[in-house]
Amino acid sequence: MEGEGVQPPDENLENGSRPRFKWKKVLRLVVSGIKAAGLLLCVVYVCLQFSSSPAKDSPIQRLRAPVTGCEGGRLFIGTSKNEYETMEVQNNSVIINCDGLYLIHLKGSFFQEVKINLHFRKDRSPIFVPMLNNGQRVVFTVVTSLAFKDEVYLTVNASDTLCEHLQINDGELIIVQLTPNGYCAPERPYSSTVNQVPL
């Protein structure tokens, strides 16, 4: 009766280690399955991205224009159109044709203290542009979300000078679209001003 119910030490170790070994094996299988499923999802995602072609490859919207004066309470945005600029200026406003995030950078020096506000959407309040050197210098950069039909323009106010008499040195406005995959309005067809005579 001495040895009944008591197993030799080797058998105890073997029986005790088997369940732990099974759990480790099951855990490894589960982790491998999760990794395989994740890899499969990544491959499917990449394949879908390559197979879906964008509806229209529109150029990145960008503008670099001189700011040379003031007209009707707005800073005058000059037009220096070149092949790399894709945005249009109308009535001292930059017209936004494509949705996305845009970087807007303004710099310049004034001979008097001014206050400048950046406007871009009718239902939004303007962004106050902080000034340097007692309100006579601006170096301002902001990233904001703009959409089709928005108009970017700058209003200026000087306490003792009329808008038309403001003097600006080295004024420049740069607008660059950072995310070019949003909606873009179709480009307007070229309209010729030449009179056409029927044949």
Curated annotation (Swiss-Prot):
Protein name: Tumor necrosis factor ligand superfamily member 4
Family classification: Belongs to the tumor necrosis factor family.
Disulfide bonds: C70-C163, C98-C184
Chain's role: Cytokine that binds to TNFRSF4. Co-stimulates T-cell proliferation and cytokine production.
One of the record's GO molecular function terms: tumor necrosis factor receptor superfamily binding
Extracellular compartment segments: 49-199
InterPro entries assigned: TNF_CS, TNF_dom, TNFSF4, Tumour_necrosis_fac-like_dom
Cross-referenced SMART domains: TNF (SM00207)
Residues linked to a glycan: N91, N157
Localization annotation: Membrane
Annotated THD domain residues: 59-176
Membrane topology: Single-pass type II membrane protein
Subunit annotation: Homotrimer.
Cytoplasmic compartment segments: 1-25
Top-rank taxon, per record: Eukaryota
Tissues expressed in: Detected in T-cell lines, but not in a macrophage cell line.
Taxonomic source organism: Rattus norvegicus
